[in-house]
Amino acid sequence: MTKILLTGFEPFLDYKLNPTMQIVENLDGEKIENYHIIGRILSVDFQQSAEQLKRHIEEIEPQIIISLGLAGGRFKITPERIAINIKDGEPDNNGYSPVDESIQEEGADAYLTNLPIRHMINRLQEEGYPAEISNTAGTYLCNNIMYEGLVYAQQHEGVRAGFIHIPASFELAIQHGKIPGWHIRDLIAAVKLCIEETVRAGNH
């Protein structure tokens, strides 16, 4: 059976929980057509998370890599178009805060996703979920992991990879107090629709 690697992150900064964990844990083991979803949670650590992703890829040998990240403050599901070869941001969970560093010293400046992001947002909107394409994944861990996934996809013909930012869950929004949120079941359903569109694009 063909495999999908679906990743999320542990809590970070002032977010006491991370709904990507709940989404990944809920969808882990699900089957969509001839694809099997395998979920993994990554550390919020610039060094460790990239190595973890590489180990998971080596173990699973996925044809599709979809990574999820929390975008606290956004109200829409936002598939990302591009990852850039820069890491620069607030401290990770081990206190490391890179400034103007390359993800890969000899790497390309940027990679465009090869996920069907236009089909994703069209499907989400048809189903009543707010969605739009994002043209920046930032320079924090989300961009870092998207870039690493796309490096693998570039090196392995037929592999598709990309990143989807999600809003907060209601639970997190209530805890935080200043960001919008969705019901966790809607976040799970929306991500599943994105996976379905990716599978459909690969089968046609």
Curated annotation (Swiss-Prot):
Q: Which Gene3D superfamilies match?
A: Peptidase C15, pyroglutamyl peptidase I-like
Q: Name one GO molecular function term.
A: pyroglutamyl-peptidase activity
Pfam (any one): Peptidase_C15
Q: Output the PROSITE patterns linked to this UniProt entry.
A: PYRASE_GLU (PS01333)
Q: Where is the active site?
A: E80, C142, H165
Q: Which GO terms describe its biological process?
A: proteolysis
- Entry EC no(s): 3.4.19.3
Q: What class of enzyme is it?
A: hydrolase
Q: Which UniProt keywords apply?
A: Cytoplasm, Hydrolase, Protease, Thiol protease
Catalysis: reaction(s): Release of an N-terminal pyroglutamyl group from a polypeptide, the second amino acid generally not being Pro
Q: What's a GO cellular component annotated to this UniProt protein?
A: cytosol
Subcellular localization is given as:
Cytoplasm
InterPro entries hit by this protein:
Peptidase_C15 (IPR000816), Peptidase_C15-like (IPR016125), Peptidase_C15-like_sf (IPR036440), PGP-I_bact-type (IPR029762), PGPEP1_Glu_AS (IPR033693)
Similarity remark: Belongs to the peptidase C15 family.
Record's HAMAP family?
A: Pyrrolid_peptidase
Describe its assembly. Answer: Homotetramer.
Which NCBIfam families does the entry mention? PRK13197.1, pyro_pdase
- UniProt function note: Removes 5-oxoproline from various penultimate amino acid residues except L-proline.
The protein's name: Pyrrolidone-carboxylate peptidase
Supply the source organism for this entry. Answer: Lysinibacillus sphaericus (strain C3-41)
